[in-house]
Amino acid sequence: MQDAFLTERSLRYDIKGRKYIDTPSKYYFEDLGLRNARLNFRQSEKTHLMENLIYNELRLRGFAVDVGQVTINTKNADGKSERKHLDVDFVCNKGYERIYIQSAFALLTEEKQEQEFNSLRRIKDNKQKIVIMGGLQPTYKNNDGI
């Protein structure tokens, strides 16, 4: 489907390690109507549609778009050290410009807010970090500059 320009592949990028990861890529439909038809109009999750729409808009604006991953070290309930992988929905590059974007249809709970913002907080550079939410929301910056 990629050869027919129906889907586009987005590679996984290790943000801290600054390299591409050899894990499964993510695919986005170039036409959401064809996506829905392919799925027989059964899966209309607004979160997936919104993420696909954002990807298409970023590509239209000339960005190279990857899926980001941030690896962190944490302690589990037993106090043992473990590695966790946090996802960043989009790592967007155009020339020297880089933007990190999280897509969240709704941030109704504290847990969901923490999940969406945590990966962006762990990126220690001065590039722009954005969380795009569904619906009509006022634009604002939090204390972390996100």
Annotate each predicted stretch with a short phrase.
Residues 5-6, 10-146:
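A cross-kingdom feature that marks ATP-driven nucleic-acid transaction machinery
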